[in-house]
């Protein structure tokens, strides 16, 4: 059930992010890359520079959200769970919420910050609180991606 609902949510978030970028961007597509694929038919609906290698940036935030939603559904955390902010997280460059070392942020607020602001400091807070480090969280994201049959 999680995979069905989780995948639907994941597809929704990806599509929303894509559309948000398209409709709010004032620059041309020549410097960006995008691809939209129909999940069921595998038909490419739209693509621009789809084969160019790029840093995944916001896609990692979407996977971070996916993992948070999975943990919420499994009741491993709640919306009220407080995530501690480390020195590393507080030092992340923009986009950020300017969280202070030693402070906390509730899961529900972290979710909103990731969706609305794509906050790097919050992504680091989530990673460190779930996996202990960004490096270990990256391994967890890779594991989730493989379970979702995602590949590069």
Language-model segments: residues:
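Bacterial N-terminal signal peptides
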Residues: 13-22
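Active-site-adjacent loops and short helices of periplasmic peptidoglycan-processing enzymes
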Residues: 24-152
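Bacterial N-terminal signal peptides that target proteins for export
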Residues: 2-14
């Amino acid at each position: 059930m999680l995979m069905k609902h989780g995948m639907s949510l994941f597809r929704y978030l990806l599509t929303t992010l894509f559309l948000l970028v398209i409709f709010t961007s004032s620059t041309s597509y020549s410097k960006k890359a995008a691809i939209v694929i129909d999940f069921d038919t595998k038909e490419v609906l739209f693509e621009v520079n789809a084969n160019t290698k790029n840093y995944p940036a916001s896609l990692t935030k979407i996977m971070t959200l996916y993992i948070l939603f999975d943990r919420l559904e499994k009741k491993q955390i709640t919306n009220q769970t407080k995530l501690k902010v480390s020195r590393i997280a507080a030092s992340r460059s923009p986009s950020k919420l300017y969280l202070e070392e030693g402070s906390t942020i509730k899961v529900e607020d972290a979710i909103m910050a990731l969706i609305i602001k794509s906050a790097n400091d919050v992504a680091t807070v989530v990673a460190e609180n779930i996996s202990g480090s960004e490096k270990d969280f990256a391994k967890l994201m890779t594991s989730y991606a493989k379970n979702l049959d995602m590949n590069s």
